[in-house]
Amino acid sequence: MTDINMNDCKMRGWMGLALWGALAAAPAGASTDLAQKNACMSCHAVAKKLVGPSYNDVAKKYAGQKDAAASLAKSIKSGGAGKWGPVPMPSQPGLSEADALALANWVLAGAK
């Protein structure tokens, strides 16, 4: 049997938690910047409808759907019309697949 040092276990636990927190927080800030950089905020807001639906409404629509992030990322990248009213969403050909997925995950997580 090995001797387990409880202080060592606690320290590793706290270090892991701190690392997880730092990693979890990074994409949110990055996605906010990404949304601003790609002019998403010109038509969308977190909690209210502008030209397009609010991010909260989008998250509600996709809630519980299998592959919601991939589906939303595809819509972000290719644009479309008729899902949210008469104003079409333009395609985003300059947006990478990874950035579209990051934006989709950010929206689905409450755009925080």
Map each language-model feature to its residues:
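N-terminal signal peptide c-region/cleavage motif recognized by signal peptidases
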Residues: 23-27
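Short, solvent-exposed mixed-charge patches
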Residues: 111-112
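Sequence/structural segment immediately N-terminal to covalent heme-attachment motifs in c-type
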Residues: 29-46
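Sec-dependent signal peptide recognition
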Residues: 10-20
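N-terminal secretory signal peptides that target proteins for export/translocation
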Residues: 1-12
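Axial heme c-ligation environment in periplasmic c-type cytochrome domains
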Residues: 42, 51-62, 74-104
